[in-house]
């Protein structure tokens, strides 16, 4: 998945839905941390997407999404990537001009929550430039999803389609 294309698309949807006002980078990064917490909650509650039921569903796509995908580990991991991409789009980050992130993690050697904490910690290191933290987060969530055998681009595309049809700020204050 091309991070630059994702960041432009995610940011466009977010702007169209009223998510961008003059707030600090920390405000938006905290919303990513919230999504990481929601991923842990989905894991704790054993909520996994039912792709087969979703794809065979006869109800409107939004209803099928809410029934079989929403609030699952896959959905929440997609939210992490989408928020990071959105912030990258707002900041005009060009991933093609960045050196690759050298971070490596043996995901299988750590628990789900430890991996979530490592992602949170990496995103919150304010001694590192915001661009590098976002790049780290994007690479981390994609590698983590791959380790979990989650087709993250598939779930990102589903969530972006779902988000495009939601109300202003998805009915939330921010």
Per-segment meaning from a language model:
Residues 1-174:
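Flexible "arm" and connector segments at domain edges
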């Amino acid at each position: 998945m091309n991070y630059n294309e994702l960041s432009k698309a995610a940011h466009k949807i977010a702007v169209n839905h009223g998510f961008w006002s003059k707030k600090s980078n920390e405000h938006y990064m905290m919303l990513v941390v919230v999504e990481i917490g929601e991923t842990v909650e989905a894991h704790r509650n054993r909520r996994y997407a039912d792709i087969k039921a979703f794809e065979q569903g006869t109800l409107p796509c939004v209803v099928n999404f809410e029934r079989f995908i929403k609030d699952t580990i896959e959905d929440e991991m997609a939210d992490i990537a989408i928020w990071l991409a959105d912030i990258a789009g707002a900041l005009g980050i060009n991933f093609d001009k960045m050196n690759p992130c050298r971070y490596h993690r043996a995901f299988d050697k750590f628990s789900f929550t430890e991996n979530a904490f490592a992602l949170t910690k990496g995103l919150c290191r304010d001694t590192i430039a915001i661009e590098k933290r976002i790049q780290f987060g994007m690479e981390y969530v994609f590698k983590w999803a791959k380790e979990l055998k989650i087709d993250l681009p598939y779930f990102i595309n589903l969530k972006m389609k779902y988000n495009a049809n939601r109300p202003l700020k998805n009915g939330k204050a921010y």
